[in-house]
Amino acid sequence: DDKYFADKLACSATPNADGYYTVKDHPIISAGISIGEDMSFRIMVEEGYENGSLKYYYIGVNGRVEGEGTIGTDTQGNSIFRIYNVNPQRADLIYVIQYYDADGNAIGAPKEISVLTYFEGFYNMEAGKNEDVEARKTFIANFLEYCASAMERSYADFPKETLDGKTWQYR
């Protein structure tokens, strides 16, 4: 069954017996960052989309870099794709992610995520009940400080390297 995408809904190209079309939400339902020994994006997909793949690209100092997410499940059993090798030096890079079904057809519009936009959204998110907003702000500030230190280290190691005409120091 061919699928196409309109607004935020994936639609079947063939109507059902009653003349209506099957409409599903976008396969990608959330994106987040996991920080542990390393950093990764975690992309949750809607139930029923665990048999597909998630491809991504970003444009860095070495041009366009492409990759494919690794599928797994979280502790609640949700299907999660992970994009590894995300690091503070790439905090300002925009990753463009696209879900593909098992047949290789792109489903839904591409989505964009970056470390900085994730934390901007996290910072501006409405506080939950009994949440310590100051702790959230401190976490974000500490993480951005960590990113800045990593950028300074990159500048020391690669002073002439540029991205979009900007050195590590400028970025």
Predicted regions and their residues:
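Short, surface-exposed linear motifs at loops/turns and structural transition points
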Residues: 1-171
